[in-house]
């Protein structure tokens, strides 16, 4: 016996939004009915005309465990994911210790099985301790369950080291995922090297420090035959480099964050460290280029770069506070309200950028509503308006620049493998 989600709205295979009933059985989608009456003896959940989408996928989150449990844990971070409609997240390796050896990856996998509320794909580090000095054992880490390889949080500074990493990853049919930043060009900055930095007398991070790493890496990826993925792209120059690389047939993909689509450095209200992230909020021209790049396919999908910190850390001020903001619980409402409701994106585009597009880029089975697919599903209320309130977050991190923003498009139910893991209003 299964359970039916009744009276929802979802996209069919032709991209048409239709009245939908979905049957969940044994952890998978057993049946889908479009524009038909439902006659069922099984249990029924009436979703009242709300949107039904594949569980959202976020391939860039920081769960902080081990070593950063004051900021977040696998349990709290994945509960935040479920609350945001995400059923699959990929956990970055800048933890203490990093998953840079087989034993640490095995420990992490066990911890995920014990405490995670949603599917977690663990990244492994490219270099030991993410120090950029010695490559990890890629084959052993893949065997232990690594999803892909990244030193996210820092850029791999040596071209030779990155090239060798790409060759090893290619031999294992694994991806290299890169935080792109040339340390010799960052200027010790806390914000973008633009008008905001000049106004407040702050050291700025120039755009070129990102683009130059991407330009280097796409050529290395071409030579190595490696799938190369660019994290949190933020500048118009970076978009241009990725666009040119794709035209040249290089296997490169890229993601963009909600905050880089929504904000630029002009929007920072004084020295508020909740607007400090890396890469920083760039210029209005950069933001416009990111939107254009997403629409024309240069940028493949959206990822949050969920980066929780404690209130005490963020209270240190914009120069001393750590980089990063949270994003799992607010991504869909923000993007729906400010891009779909305003006609910049279609609803289908937004859903695809948060589901099937990341799945296709990394060969995941998730990200689609189809018979036989995993029953990873989110139900979203497109009508109710609510203000973002960090005090209600499931995440330990409350560090968001979007407090008080009124949004529609709030998830109300999240299913992972057919199990209801979060429902609005239920403890």
Swiss-Prot record:
The active site is at 305. It is an enzyme of class 3 (hydrolase). Binds 2 Zn(2+) ions per subunit. PROSITE patterns: DIHYDROOROTASE_1 (PS00482), DIHYDROOROTASE_2 (PS00483). GO terms for biological process: 'de novo' UMP biosynthetic process; purine nucleobase catabolic process. Pathway: Pyrimidine metabolism; UMP biosynthesis via de novo pathway; (S)-dihydroorotate from bicarbonate: step 3/3. Zn(2+) 2 binds at residues 152, 179, 232. Its EC number is 3.5.2.3. Keywords: Hydrolase, Metal-binding, Pyrimidine biosynthesis, Zinc. Zn(2+) 1 binds at residues 60, 62, 152, 305. Its cofactor is Zn(2+). It catalyses: (S)-dihydroorotate + H2O = N-carbamoyl-L-aspartate + H(+). Substrate binds at residues 62-64, 94, 278, 309, 323-324. GO terms for molecular function: allantoinase activity; dihydroorotase activity; zinc ion binding. InterPro entries: DHOase, DHOase/Allantoinase_Hydrolase, DHOase_bac, Dihydroorotase_CS, Metal-dep_hydrolase_composite, Metal_Hydrolase. Catalyzes the reversible cyclization of carbamoyl aspartate to dihydroorotate. Belongs to the metallo-dependent hydrolases superfamily. DHOase family. Class I DHOase subfamily. This is Dihydroorotase.
């Amino acid at each position: 016996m299964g359970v039916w989600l009744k009276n929802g709205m979802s996209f069919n295979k032709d991209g048409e939004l239709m009245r939908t009933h979905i049957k969940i059985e044994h952890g998978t989608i057993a049946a889908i009915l479009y524009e038909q009456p439902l006659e069922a003896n099984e249990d029924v959940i009436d979703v009242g005309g709300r949107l039904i989408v594949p569980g959202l996928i976020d391939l860039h989150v920081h769960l902080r465990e081990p070593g950063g449990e004051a900021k977040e844990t696998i349990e709290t971070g994945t509960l935040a994911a479920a609350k945001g409609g995400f059923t699959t997240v990929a956990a970055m390796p800048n933890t203490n210790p990093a998953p840079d050896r087989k034993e640490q990856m095995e420990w992490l996998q066990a911890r995920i099985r014990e405490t995670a509320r949603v599917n977690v794909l663990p990244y492994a580090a490219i270099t030991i301790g993410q120090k950029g000095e010695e490559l990890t054992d890629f084959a052993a880490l893949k065997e232990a369950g690594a999803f892909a390889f990244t030193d996210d949080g820092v850029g791999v500074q040596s071209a030779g080291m990155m090239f060798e990493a790409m060759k090893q990853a290619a031999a294992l049919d694994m991806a290299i995922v890169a935080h792109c930043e040339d340390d010799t060009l960052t200027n010790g900055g806390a914000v973008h090297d633009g008008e905001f930095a000049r106004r407040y007398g702050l050291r700025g991070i120039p755009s070129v420090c990102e683009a130059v790493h991407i330009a280097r890496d796409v050529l290395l990826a071409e030579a190595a035959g490696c799938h190369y993925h660019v994290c949190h792209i933020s500048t118009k120059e970076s978009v241009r480099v990725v666009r040119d690389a794709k035209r040249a047939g290089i296997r490169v993909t890229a993601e963009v964050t909600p905050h880089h689509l929504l904000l630029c450095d002009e929007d920072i209200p004084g020295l508020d460290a909740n607007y400090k992230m890396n890469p920083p909020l760039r210029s209005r021209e950069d933001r416009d280029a990111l939107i254009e790049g997403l629409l024309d396919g240069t940028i493949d999908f959206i990822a949050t770069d969920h980066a929780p910190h404690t209130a005490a850390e963020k209270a240190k001020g914009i120069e001393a506070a750590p980089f990063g903001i949270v994003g799992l619980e607010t991504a869909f409402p923000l993007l729906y309200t400010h891009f779909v409701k305003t006609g910049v994106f279609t609803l289908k585009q937004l859903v695809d950028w948060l589901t099937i597009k990341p799945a296709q880029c990394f060969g995941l089975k998730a990200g689609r509503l189809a018979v036989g697919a995993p029953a990873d599903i989110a139900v979203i209320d497109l009508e109710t308006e609510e203000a973002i309130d960090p005090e209600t977050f499931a995440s330990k991190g409350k560090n968001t620049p979007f407090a008080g923003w009124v949004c529609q498009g709030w998830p109300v139910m999240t299913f992972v493998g057919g199990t209801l893991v979060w429902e609005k209003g239920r403890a």
